[in-house]
Amino acid sequence: MNKKPIILVTNDDGIVAPGIRALVHSMNLLGDVYVVAPNKPQSGVGHAITMNTILYCDSVKIDNGNQKEWECSGTPVDCVKLAISDILPRKPDICVSGINHGSNSSINIMYSGTVSAVIEASIEGIPSVGFSLLDFDWNADFEPSKKYVCQIVKKILYNPIPEKIITLNVNIPKLKREQIKGIKICRQADSKWKESFDKRYNPKGKTYYWLVGDFLNLDDEKVDTDEWALKNGYISIVPIQFDLTNYTILNLLKSWNFFVLFVFFLDT
C-alpha cells in the first residue's frame, strides 16, 4: 500500500465509550482515521437501520489526536452507510468497530451492533474487523488489547487476499498482557441464550418486563471454537460473511421434487 490508508472507526457503545477511544488512539498510528459513531449506546441493535426518522450527524472532537470525528443519531450500520456515502473523501481501506465492552463471541454475533457495522462494510467491499473485550465494565482496561488490535489491522491492510473481502470477528479475553497466550483462528461456537422475562408492575399497575437469561455453550470442549480459545486465554479470530446460505442443505433441497409434492397435496 503506497498511500496512507483511510481507516473508518465505529462502534455500538457510543462515541465517548472508552473502548472506541482506545481503538481510535491505536488506529492513529496506522493511517488517516475517520470516526463516525453513535451519539448514544446502541448495544444489541444488530443490523438495524434508521427509517422514517430523521438522521442527524454532527462533527465533534472528543479527545486529542489527528482523527476527524462525527457523532450520529442512528445505529452502527447507519454510521457506516453514512460515512461511506457522504462523509469520507473516498472508500476506506478498512473499517474497524469496537472495542466493544463485552463479548461478541459465538451466538452473540447475531445481536451485535459492533459486528453488524463491519458486516455492512463488507457488503460494500471493504475489509473490516470487529473487536470486543470480555469486560462489560465502563472502566475496562483496554491497554492489553492495543498491541493485538494494531497487529491484526496491519495484517489485513498489507496482506490483502485477491477477490476476497476479509471480515473478522475478534474477541479478547479479560487478562493482563502477559497472561494472553496468543491468537487462535477459530470457528463460531454452537451456543444460545436461554432467556426469560422478569415480569414486574409499575406504581400504576402497568406490566413491564426485564429480559434475563443464561448463556449456554453447546460446544463446551470443542478446541476449535472461539469460546474454547477465550476460556483458555487466547484471542479468538473468526472469519465471517454476510452470505447466510446453508450450503449443506442447498444441495439436498435441489434433490427435492417440488412438482411431485405439489401434486400430492392437490390429491389429498
Residue locations for each model-derived region?
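A cross-family phosphate/adenosyl-ligand binding-site feature
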Residues: N2-K3, I7-T10, P18-D86, R90-K91
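Hydrophobic/aromatic beta-strand patches that form the interior of the parallel beta-sheet core
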Residues: Y34-V36, W70, V129-F131, L168-V170, ...
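Alpha-helix C-terminal capping segments
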Residues: A83-P89, S116-P127
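Short, Asp-centered acidic motifs that coordinate Mg2+ and/or phosphate
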Residues: I94
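Glycine/threonine-rich flexible loop motifs
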Residues: S103-S112
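Glycine-rich phosphate/pyrophosphate-binding loops
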Residues: S122-P144
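Electrostatically charged, flexible surface regions
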Residues: E143-L261
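Short hydrophobic targeting helices and cationic amphipathic motifs
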Residues: F265-L266
